């Protein structure tokens, strides 16, 4: 933050933590350890990116994404950190699932990985954002 760079802080659980019902606990710990207390929407972006979803073609359902986004917003408020910080979703985003993901509450955008290397598909996702 002191260098005037805006970090995207990626947080996410692995498959075992998710299966064991520890996803929320893991994400809270990651937030505690990685989000500076002076963070705000002008100097920080958060991205929920479940590790198990990256490159797998699988994503959590919208209910799970919403639960995580709401928990992150609550964590920001509880820690007296600007809760208008954008929260992105990343992890196997593609043109087939982007529209549904965009419908999530508290979503500030998408963190797009491999599909960003496919100009036509990436453009379609960008159009969906409008």
Q: What is each stretch, according to the model?
A:
Residues 1-130:
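Active-site loop-to-helix "anion-binding N-cap" substructures in soluble metabolic enzymes
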